[in-house]
Amino acid sequence: MKAIIFLFAVLTVVAIIIPIISGEPNAGPHAASIDLNEIMKKMRPDLLKMLDDIKTKIQG
């Protein structure tokens, strides 16, 4: 669980900072949220599988 939270935090920071550094005109949280959504769409199957594994471990 800590790994998921850490990964999400890193992706959020990267998605917000990179557009600002690269000087995009619409840089900032709005532009970053679009990038983050794209990343999450690609990650979703892996994330769902991980959450499923965690759930089965908890349930026994």
Swiss-Prot record:
- What is the residue range of the signal peptide feature? 1-23
Alphabetically sorted, this entry's keywords are: Amidation, Neurotoxin, Secreted, Signal, Toxin
Main subcellular localisation: secreted
Quote the subcellular location field of this record: Secreted
- Expression by tissue: Expressed by the venom gland.
Q: Which residues are trimmed away as propeptide when the chain matures?
A: 24-33
Annotated GO MF terms? toxin activity
Pull one GO CC term from this UniProt entry: extracellular region
Q: Which residues carry this modification: Glutamine amide?
A: 59
UniProt record similarity statement: Belongs to the formicidae venom clade 2 family.
Q: What job does the chain carry out?
A: Toxin that causes a rapid and irreversible paralysis when intrathoracically injected into insects (blowflies). Does not cause spontaneous nocifensive behaviors by intraplantar injection in mice.
Protein name (database record): Myrmicitoxin(1)-Pr4a
Source organism per UniProt: Pogonomyrmex rugosus (Desert harvester ant)
